[in-house]
Regions:
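Short amphipathic alpha-helical coiled-coil/interface segments
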Residues: 105-109
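Active-site acidic catalytic loop and adjacent metal/ATP-binding pocket
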Residues: 21, 56, 110-171, 181-182
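Active-site activation/catalytic loop segments of kinase-like enzymes and analogous catalytic loops
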Residues: 82-92, 164-203, 218-234
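ATP-binding pocket architecture of kinase catalytic cores
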Residues: 1-79, 83, 90-93, 118
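Glycan-recognition and catalytic cores of secretory/periplasmic carbohydrate-active enzymes
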Residues: 63, 71-78, 125, 131, ...
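All-alpha amphipathic helical-bundle segments outside canonical DNA-binding/catalytic cores
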Residues: 69-75, 205-217
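Alpha-helix N-cap/helix-start motif at coil-to-helix transitions, marked by capping-box chemistry
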Residues: 17, 25, 47, 75-82, ...
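Conserved P-loop NTPase mechanochemical-coupling segment
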Residues: 90-103
Length: 235
């Protein structure tokens, strides 16, 4: 990814046999922290993150990246929906709903999964692109009074689960982030920005863009609820 222009940490040394790796230190300033410290720069920071997202969404398969062998297909999407049913509904909430009702929920999930998996124009997705996985690095301090310095850069981490999917998936991860809630008005403005700036990538009408945004946001949120439900149930 780094060789193809995506801002990821540089790896200086790795030894797969021992599991040892030495990589670039990105510091401790995440986008999540920067948003809290700079409430007047929220739109600017998110717009930069959206433009950064386009860098990997433009990537073409060069035969080297394993992410292009994986996809958000029906099987993967249903695994995440089933994870929610098993670990949040059954595990955390201890639902007493009859199996027939849970099967009806699963049938509804399957329809959504089939719609999300149907489009052929899938692209490289980070899969967990939220404010805690974006680091701000620069040669100058990030001054809350001045906003981001001119020589800072956003780096991404935690991209090991990357796979092919719709461009809306990473956008949902970013704008429907439980760690950094946005107002509906601000989210709508950032969606407008993403639609206009990303036309060459998504190649959708606004109605199509919004349709897949809504489906992706629902699926991504249910997936997150499954993860948090499992964590809470385990204590």
């Amino acid at each position: 990814l780094r060789e193809r222009g995506v801002a990821v940490p540089e790896i200086f040394f790795s030894d797969p046999a021992t599991g040892v790796m030495l990589q670039q230190d990105l510091g401790d300033l995440s986008l999540n922290q920067a948003l809290k410290e700079n409430p007047d720069k929220v739109d600017l920071l998110y717009q930069d993150a959206i433009l950064h997202m386009f860098n990997w969404q433009r990537l073409a398969d060069d035969g080297q990246c394993p992410a292009f062998r994986l996809s958000f297909d029906v099987e993967k999407l249903m695994f995440e929906f089933d994870f929610f049913i098993d670990h949040t509904l059954r595990g955390y909430y201890k639902t007493t709903a009859p199996d027939a009702e849970l099967k009806e929920i699963r049938r509804a999930f399957l329809k959504i999964a089939e719609k999300l998996a149907a489009p052929a124009n899938k692209i490289f997705t980070h899969r967990d692109y939220h404010s805690r996985n974006i680091m701000l690095v620069g040669s100058e301090p990030f001054d809350s009074a001045q906003g981001p310095p001119p020589h800072y850069r956003q780096f991404i981490i935690d991209f090991q689960d990357a796979r092919l999917g719709l461009m809306q998936y990473d956008l949902c991860s970013l704008l429907c982030d439980a760690y950094a809630p946005l107002s509906l008005e601000r989210r709508a403005g950032l969606l407008d920005f993403a639609f206009e700036q990303g036309k060459e990538i998504h190649r959708q009408t606004r109605a199509e863009f919004d349709h897949y945004w809504q489906l992706s946001a629902f699926q991504r949120t249910v997936k997150a609820m499954g993860t948090f439900g499992r964590q809470a149930a385990l204590g």
